[in-house]
Design a protein with these regions (language model features):
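N-terminal, charge-rich alpha-helical recognition modules
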Residues: 1-77
Length: 77
């Protein structure tokens, strides 16, 4: 199964369980701050920065936010 079949906020091909777990925690953060996440998860900031870049967290968060906005719009109309 290739990434093209996955929604961006789902675990991606090659993404470790630990990296995906950190991504989910990042996705749920109000301010989405890697330094705060590192403290919360007791992980090194550099590790999280590497995962953020390697697994495209920023783009995936944008897709997630857009999906939520579409759902909110559809339920409001």
């Amino acid at each position: 199964m290739g990434n093209e079949n996955l929604r961006p906020w789902e675990r991606q091909d090659g993404e470790t369980e630990k990296a995906f777990s950190a991504f989910k925690a990042y996705l749920e953060m109000e301010d989405r701050n890697v330094t705060s996440l590192a403290k919360r998860l007791s992980k090194s900031r550099q590790l999280l920065v590497n995962w953020k870049q390697k697994y495209n967290w920023q783009e995936r968060c944008i897709a997630w936010d857009k999906s939520l906005q579409e759902i909110e719009y559809k339920t409001a109309v």
